[in-house]
Each structure stands twice: as C-alpha cells, then as structure tokens.
Amino acid sequence: MDNARPAIYHLSVIFEKLLNNVMVRLTCGRPKSFDKEIALEKALDVFWTQGYDGASLKDLTQAMGINKPSMYATFGNKEQLYFQAVEMYKNREGAPFFSALEQPQIRDVIETIFSRTAEAKCSNEKNKGCLMIQSSLACSDESSVVKISALKMRAEFIQLIQNRFERAANDGQLVQNADIQVMTHYAVTMLDGLQIHSIDSPPPEMLESVAKIAAEHLFQFCLPLSSQ
C-alpha cells in the first residue's frame, strides 16, 4: 500500500500540470473584451481613409485594438466588416440628409442639404470625402461586390433626391415644366463636388459659399412662397 502512494501521487501531479497547461492555452486564446461599436467605428475610419482595397487586415485589427480571431468571431471576414461599417456610415452621415428631405418646403430642403454638407465637411478634423464615392471608384475587380454595393447606395441616394423634387412639383412648389432630371443630377453633382473638394481642406467659408451658390442655382426652379 505504501509503494502505491508515490505512484498515485505522481499521477495526480502530472494530471494537475496537464490541466494547468490546458487552462493557460484556453486563457491565451480567449479574445479580450472590447467595445464592438468603438471597434467598428475604428474600422470605418480605416476604410474611409484608405479605401476597401487599401485597408489590410493588419491595418484594421491594429486600429480596432483586437486580433484577427476576435475580428472574425465578432464581425466576420473583411467584406462583412466593411458592410457593417457602411451601415454605421449610412446611419451617422445620412441622418442629417434624411431629416432635411422631410421639410415641407423644397427651398428649405435645398438650402439645408447643401449647408449641412458643407458644415459636416468643415467640422471634420480630417476630411475624407465620401465613402461611397471612393468605394465605387477605387475598387479592384476582386472587390466587385463592394463596388456594386457602393453604386447601388449611390443610386438610392440619387433616387431619394429625385423623389423629393417630384413631390415638390406635385405640391406646386416648382416652376412649370421644371426639368426634374436636370435638377436632380445638378444637385448630386454639386454635393459630390463639395465632398470631394473637402479632401483638399479648403477654408470652411469657401465651402459654405460654394454650397450657397449651388443652392441658389436650384432656387430658380422653385416658386416663391407667395406664388404657391
């Protein structure tokens, strides 16, 4: 019986060491806790600054403060992470635009979407332009899904503006025979231009003046309130 005790003791020691090694490995492999929204915001900033193709997994995980296994477990692959970042971009950057479209008077709509675009670009410490424009222009053939998605979102954006002008026409707020297609594409061209030009960091008052002139050009298609 005395000879059996050392053998049992040694087995228990070996088992304990094995158990400790397993626990250490599990602990090391366990992802650190992190704020998902903040991590996604950091990923959005990388995609916005470097583009989809230019953003490497190393760039993304370093900015997010997580490792690759944690990224895959939480957000999926790079493409899935990008689309979640785009949804965040749409909700945050698009909110002022969507609320502007709901104003009853088309003159107020026009003035607001241009002034808010200029203000948003002037308020950013690092102007990055428009994520959707950059994604649609700077994607390789391998990233065609991303490019198609960006083009689809831009088409939806254009359609929203056209729908609002059509509503204004039906409400008698536009001059007779106003060319809604031309108005729509003029508005989109000028809004795109403001966002692209903001990358050059022009003086804020310059962007605001350009936005004001663009809005005034569209006012020529709008009836004054007294005539409605």
Feature annotation, model-predicted:
Residues 84, 98-128, 180-187:
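Hydrophobic alpha-helical connector segments
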Residues 128, 133, 178-197, 210-217:
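Hydrophobic alpha-helical segments that form the core
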Residues 24, 38, 46-80, 84:
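Helix-turn-helix
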Residues 2-26, 114-119, 155-159, 163-167, ...:
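C-terminal peripheral helix-coil segments that are non-catalytic and often amphipathic
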Residues 104, 108, 144-170, 182:
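Amphipathic alpha-helical packing segments from all-alpha helical-bundle domains
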Residues 35-44, 60, 85-89, 93, ...:
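Generic hydrophobic, amphipathic alpha-helix propensity
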Residues 110, 124-145:
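Amphipathic alpha-helical segments used for helix-helix packing
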